[in-house]
């Protein structure tokens, strides 16, 4: 599930957004009282920023349906990458197969093998974990189309209507050293324990919100530790090199606090498609392999320049927003609930308002 803005640019438009959401309502988990209600209309945008949930399965199916049959090869884990001369990359799969390619885009998530190949270190654990869940209401859930966020008591959680019948929720928490030793392992392995743990962390929350968590089926929850890439690595690292580049979580694993990880991956797919289409244009078909390779490398370098600062910005903002929204203690509670509430939501929404252009290449 991701929060995103629906773009109406480009030749084809797919409307995958669920219910358009009108505002973000923040509530203190300490007091149970609302601290801000920010409408999306108040966020400066280019006029086509619609916020809503996109169901991951629907997005993947829509993208896959656009490709010729047989383009996607499933269950093909990349285990090693080697340069073959200056032009080709040899990709070794777990089942022993070798593939040869001129371009390799590593979008293999937070444990990216391609990021290893480009010299990035493994993303760091941020000391927080996240649980996600989904609840279906046969007769409708009755919630307004708003994002409901709760902060304080060392947790940060939210409930988001996807449509009239589905609610998505998340909760992030910092395992205490004790929980780390005993309960944390148990939590990931035992959904009953996980649910009890979540219910114990909600704080002062109106009953109708608590009921969402109580109603969640055990198999509809997933829990995972949160990891991110240090921003300085993104400043200095090789986002692209010798026809290989990174996109999505492989490039910028970030905490989920501004809901932009998957949105940024989509931005990258648009920019990459545009740049590579330009580099591989058919009217260059008589060029030598070396010339073509140089064009590919130039296009990936241009892509890397476009994404470097955006990635640094998103990873850093997400981290800072998470620290402020999840921390506790009297001073932090006061600052977050009385002074920063609107600012933090505004920062989140501003990051979503990004124009990555259209798929059509500019005439150059
Ligand atoms: C609690 C939580 C809430 C979130 N909320 C939002 C939100 O509201 N909005 C938003 O935009 N983002 C959100 N995100 C982030 C979002 O889920 C990720 O940024 C997004 O899924 C990244 O997509 P990706 O394709 O880069 O990586 P993934 O989704 O991780 O996909 C990677 C793919 O690569 C494959 N793969 C892995 N290793 C290999 C290998 N060696 N060889 C071949 N294939 C491989 C995997 O099987 C997988 O299919 C949230 C994340 C969390 C944890």
PLM features per residue range, with description:
Residues 18, 23-32, 211, 258, ...:
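C-terminal helical "tail/cap" subdomain of flavin- and related membrane-associated enzymes
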Residues 1-66, 75, 322-325, 332:
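Active-site-adjacent segment of FAD-dependent monooxygenases/related oxidoreductases
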Residues 50, 54, 60-219:
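Conserved FAD-binding catalytic core of PHBH/FMO-like flavoproteins
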Residues 9, 58, 62, 113, ...:
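Alpha-helical elements of Rossmann-like donor-binding domains used by nucleotide-donor carbohydrate transfer enzymes
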Residues 3, 38, 76, 85, ...:
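Short, flexible helix/strand-to-coil boundary loops that buttress conserved ligand/catalytic motifs
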Residues 2-6, 10, 203-223, 284-300:
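Acidic/histidine metal-binding catalytic segments
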Residues 106, 131, 220-320:
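Conserved mid-domain beta->alpha element of the FAD-binding
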Residues 38-46, 176-182, 284, 318-321:
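Short glycine/proline- and charge-enriched loop/turn segments
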């Amino acid at each position: 599930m991701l929060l995103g803005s629906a773009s109406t640019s480009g030749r084809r438009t797919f409307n995958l957004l669920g219910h358009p959401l009108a505002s973000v309502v923040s509530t203190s988990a300490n007091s149970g009282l609302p601290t801000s209600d920010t409408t999306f209309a108040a966020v400066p945008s280019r006029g086509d920023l619609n916020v809503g949930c996109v169901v991951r399965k629907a997005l993947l199916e829509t993208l896959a349906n656009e490709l010729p049959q047989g383009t996607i090869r499933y269950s093909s884990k990349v285990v090693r990458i080697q340069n073959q001369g200056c032009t080709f990359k040899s990709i070794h799969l777990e089942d022993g197969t070798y593939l040869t390619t001129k371009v390799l885009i590593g979008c293999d998530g937070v444990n990216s093998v391609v990021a290893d190949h480009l010299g990035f270190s493994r993303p760091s654990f941020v000391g927080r974990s996240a649980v996600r869940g989904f609840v279906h209401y046969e007769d409708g859930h009755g919630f307004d189309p708003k994002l409901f966020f709760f902060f304080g008591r060392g947790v940060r959680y939210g409930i988001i209507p996807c449509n009239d019948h589905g609610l998505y929720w998340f909760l992030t928490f910092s395992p205490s050293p004790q929980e780390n030793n005993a309960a944390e392992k148990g939590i990931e392995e035992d959904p009953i324990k996980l649910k009890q743990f979540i219910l114990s962390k909600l704080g002062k929350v109106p009953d109708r919100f608590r009921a969402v968590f109580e109603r969640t089926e055990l198999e509809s929850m997933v829990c995972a530790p949160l990891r991110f890439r240090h921003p300085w690595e993104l400043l200095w690292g090789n986002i692209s090199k010798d026809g290989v580049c990174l996109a999505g979580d492989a490039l910028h694993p970030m905490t989920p606090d501004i809901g932009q990880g998957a949105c940024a991956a989509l931005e990258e797919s648009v920019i990459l498609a545009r740049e590579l289409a330009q580099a591989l244009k058919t009217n260059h078909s008589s060029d030598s392999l070396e010339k073509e390779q140089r064009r590919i490398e130039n296009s990936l370098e241009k892509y890397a320049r476009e994404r470097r600062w955006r990635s640094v910005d998103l990873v850093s903002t997400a981290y800072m927003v998470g620290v402020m929204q999840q921390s506790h203690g009297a001073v932090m509670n006061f600052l977050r609930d009385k002074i920063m509430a609107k600012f933090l939501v505004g920062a989140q929404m501003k990051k979503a308002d990004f124009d990555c252009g259209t798929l059509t290449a500019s005439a150059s």
